[in-house]
């Protein structure tokens, strides 16, 4: 009771004062049973292969392949975090429009990965370019580096396609 004799109302329940998060993807391990969860897993696997292959080629053209490494490693880590947020169920506790965040994330990564794929393809196409190093003409990429870069280009394309499929699914969820 207050000093005036009127009863004091109970404090509001915080669970009732916050709106529910907007997400149509399931939380927990059920995310892995959806197409979106499967694509995120493929993005992680193929994206990891891209940066491992680029790193194993000893990065002969750092100006081009440095961006490919940055994009592939950043997307790999962010996709792991994205999947971890859904697997842990945090999406049900944070009030956010997760459908829009899913769309915005996949749109951004798709654009950057498409650029990285083009740069990796450009690097691979320089295989026959010869450079003059003190009177000895050598190819810019050795045969081993060329083969590794071909594989990295293929996996960069596959990863870009996976991000594109995830983008399409996210767009359908965000704009029904």
From Swiss-Prot:
InterPro entries linked to this entry: MAL, Marvel, MARVEL-CKLF_proteins
PROSITE patterns documented for this protein: MARVEL
Entry membrane topology: Multi-pass membrane protein
BP GO annotations: myelination
TM region(s), chain numbering: 35-55, 67-87, 103-123, 150-170
Annotated ranges, domain MARVEL: 31-175
Glycosylated residues, chain numbering: 132
Subcellular location: Cell membrane; Apical cell membrane
A GO CC annotation given for this chain: apical plasma membrane
One annotated GO molecular function: structural constituent of myelin sheath
Residues on Lumenal side: 56-66, 124-149
Cytoplasmic compartment spans: 1-34, 88-102, 171-176
Keyword set, alphabetical order: Cell membrane, Glycoprotein, Membrane, Transmembrane, Transmembrane helix
Family per record: Belongs to the MAL family.
Binding partners and assembly: Interacts with TPD52L2.
Function as written in the Swiss-Prot or TrEMBL entry: Member of the machinery of polarized transport. Required for the indirect transcytotic route at the step of the egress of the transcytosing cargo from perinuclear endosomes in order for it to travel to the apical surface via a raft-dependent pathway.
Name of the protein in its database record: Protein MAL2
Species in which this protein is naturally found: Bos taurus
Phylogenetic placement of the source organism: Eukaryota, Metazoa, Chordata, Craniata, Vertebrata
Gene that produces this protein: MAL2
């Amino acid at each position: 009771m207050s000093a005036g004799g009127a009863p004091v109302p109970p404090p509001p329940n915080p669970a009732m004062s916050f709106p529910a998060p907007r997400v149509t993807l399931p939380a927990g391990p059920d995310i892995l049973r959806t197409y979106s969860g499967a694509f995120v897993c493929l993005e992680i696997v193929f994206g990891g292969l891209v940066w491992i292959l680029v790193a194993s080629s000893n990065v002969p053209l750092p100006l081009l392949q440095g961006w490919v490494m940055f994009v592939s490693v950043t997307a790999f880590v962010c996709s792991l975090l994205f999947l971890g947020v859904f697997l842990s169920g945090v999406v049900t506790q944070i009030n956010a429009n997760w459908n829009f965040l899913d769309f915005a994330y996949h749109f951004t990564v798709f654009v950057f990965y498409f650029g990285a794929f083009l740069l990796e393809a450009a690097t691979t196409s320089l295989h026959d370019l010869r450079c003059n190093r003190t009177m000895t003409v050598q190819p810019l990429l050795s045969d081993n580096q060329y083969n590794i870069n071909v594989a990295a280009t293929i996996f960069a394309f596959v990863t870009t396609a996976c991000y594109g499929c995830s983008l399409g699914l996210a767009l359908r969820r965000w704009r029904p």
